[in-house]
Amino acid sequence: EARAEVREGARVAALLHDDRGRVAGVRWSGSDGVARDLRAPLVVGADGRRSLVARAVGAELPYRSSASGRACYFGYWEDPDESWREIAAQWREGPDLGTAFPCDDGLVLALVQPPVGRREAFREDLEGAYRATIAAIPPLAARLAGARLVGRVRSATGIESYFRRSSGPGWALAGDAGHFKDPVTAQGIRDALRYGRLLGEAAAAVLDDPVALDRATAAWERQRELDCLEVYQWTNVLARGEPMSPIEVELYRAAAAEPSLAGDLLDVFSRARRPSRVLSPPRAALLAARALLRPGARRDALQ
């Protein structure tokens, strides 16, 4: 058993510190509004992009960040098409990007990510602009044929990918609190689960030794950055809100004709392979040459 004690309906108001300034717990209150102190050798802020813990320890400002060129709008649809029940798919049409994820209870999540410059149209008519963007991505529109939108359309704008300082004396930031990537590559849940587990494994054996604990959380943070940096950079390219480059077009054409390359691309999404292994310099040069040989090719588009 994990021997975890769960306190539902609790709200953390502040961090506690010992006489050396080390984080030593949290001040929280329940539904009765009474403030209580809970002390711990390690406080983990797994409290999202607007992390209270990050603010309290002075780590809110990222040391590496990239503003997304896309906004995000999504809704859930009743999905009668059983043939897609276990298939997630993503399409790009001009500057637009659309994704469909199968969910529980016969639902499919349909997400569109148009360039941020179109936000005004969504402000004026959220559902209308959402449906219009789906219609502008024919494969996504075909995927949703016969499906029915249930509930309201939701939005996420002002998206910024980042790395925050994520460890210090008695504290650590897990999940989106410490590192966030644009949802275009759908990596957030994977990374939150993986590095949350690795943080627990790193800290468990040294909770009674503050010096060793701080070393362990610092090493965990370094490993997370080494593991995630390349995917972060790849995500930022896809999040620019621009049409595919000629090299990207050639890459997907090649993948359509070469099952092994298609598998390699899927491995990038599943993190079994690094993006640089798929789009290596020799392959990029070959794809660029193919793009230049296309009728009407523009050399400036390859710069």
Q: Where are the model-predicted features located?
A:
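Short acidic (Asp/Glu) and glycine-rich catalytic loops that position anionic groups and cofactors
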Residues: A110-V112, R197, E230
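C-terminal helical "tail/cap" subdomain of flavin- and related membrane-associated enzymes
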Residues: A204-Q303
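Predominantly flavin-linked oxidoreductase catalytic cores and closely associated redox partners
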Residues: A2-L140
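Alpha-helix boundary recognition
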Residues: E1, I134-A135, A145, R154, ...
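Secondary-structure boundary/capping signal
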Residues: V6, L61, A141-A142, V211, ...
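FAD/FMN-dependent oxidoreductases across multiple families
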Residues: R118-D214
